[in-house]
């Protein structure tokens, strides 16, 4: 499979497949394709894994697209202004995505639910208990909100992140919450009560404009009908 990511604010990934090659995606993610791409809808692992995908923000059923009789082309566009990033997934090198980030992947990549190990990170971290775990072997594409900044964390090195800006991280990273120090800072600082701490080793990808922040910014301008 060869691919090209086009566009900046509203990107799309265009994939060129050899005959017989397959890609998986959630329902409704396909933007355009060549006529020889054959679609099959499947639970892809049974009802248990389908329910897990639903918990992680994706649809229960996935579509498998296969290039029939020759080379095929299929494109997947981002659903929100932001970035599409490719990730090379290998056995034992899983990735953790924010909820609903998974866009598409080569057949052989598996999407499942990832529960945060520490209750505090789920209760106060701002994104809930559930994220997405991507495993297997192949290239996976994820869509993130705004631009993406990547950091390589050494063992024990930590970065503190405001709620919602965590886009993805290596499964080797550890996630926890940190309380904002001082009651005055909590009440008047405008940053909330808690931040998320990510500790290496591993890589972390941060997004500049979480969709939740966009929603909060435009909410005061939405007519209420009164």
Predicted regions mapped to residue ranges:
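Composition-driven recognition of glycine/serine/threonine/acidic- and proline-rich low-complexity segments
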Residues: 1-226
């Amino acid at each position: 499979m060869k691919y090209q990511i086009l566009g900046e604010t509203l990107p799309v990934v265009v994939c060129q497949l050899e005959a017989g090659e397959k890609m998986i995606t959630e329902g409704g993610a396909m933007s355009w394709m060549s006529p020889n791409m054959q679609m099959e809808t499947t639970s892809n692992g049974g009802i248990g894994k389908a329910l897990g995908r639903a918990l992680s923000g994706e649809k229960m059923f996935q579509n498998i697209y296969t290039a029939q009789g020759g080379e095929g082309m299929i494109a997947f566009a981002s659903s929100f202004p932001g970035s599409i990033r490719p990730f090379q997934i290998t056995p034992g090198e899983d990735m953790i995505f924010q909820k609903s980030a998974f866009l598409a992947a080569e057949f052989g990549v598996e999407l499942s639910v990832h529960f945060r190990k520490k209750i505090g990170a789920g209760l106060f971290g701002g994104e809930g208990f559930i994220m997405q775990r991507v495993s297997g072997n192949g290239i996976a594409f994820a869509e993130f909100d705004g631009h993406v900044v990547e950091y390589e964390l050494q063992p024990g090195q930590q970065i503190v992140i405001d709620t919602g800006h965590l886009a993805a991280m290596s499964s080797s990273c550890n996630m926890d919450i940190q309380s904002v120090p001082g009651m005055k800072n909590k009440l008047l600082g405008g940053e909330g009560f808690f931040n998320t701490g990510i500790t290496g080793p591993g890589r972390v990808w941060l997004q500049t404009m979480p969709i939740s922040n966009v929603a909060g910014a435009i909410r005061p301008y939405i007519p209420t009908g009164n």
